[in-house]
Amino acid sequence: IGHYYWDLLVRDSDRVEAFRELFGDERADYQQALDNYYANGAPEDWQDRCISAYAASHPWEDWAESFAHYLHIVDTLETSEHFGITTERRLPDGAVQGAAPDFDSYGVADFGPIIDQWAPLTFALNSINRSMGQTDTYPFVLSPKSIEKLGFVHQVIRDNRL
């Protein structure tokens, strides 16, 4: 789905240069990039700059993976809001981090508050799953660069809403 929205919202827009600065130049040969990924795997530093190993294969895949994760994040936050789920945990420095039950991820202009809600919620969900002997519901670590890319996706979507 991310590929479709890249064509619709980024390809011919004034954001394509910002996209290239953040994700890389999508004009690089796509098939060659995928062949290289399947032959050699992801670069060693993929975790510093991409949301998944596959995202490191080509800028289009980086966008598509980021877009998919963005949908996971806002959909999960919306579901938790619908059910009134709230979380709160004390951090090592004594600060309290929590997710509010009435948070509207679609209504915020900046992506920062979304991550602020997402982090404690996924920590709680992953902890519950582990308590039940299951794998994490969201086993991904979001690097600062990945969060920046998710923020870009958020802005593109907000700027193009109807």
Where in the sequence are the language-model features?
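Long C-terminal interaction/binding lobes of large macromolecular proteins
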Residues: 51
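Active-site-adjacent bridging/hinge elements
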Residues: 32-45, 96-97
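Pan-zinc metallopeptidase signature
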Residues: 54-162
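Post-HEXXH active-site segment of zinc metalloproteases
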Residues: 7-38
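Active-site recognition of the HExxH zinc-binding catalytic motif
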Residues: 1-11, 64
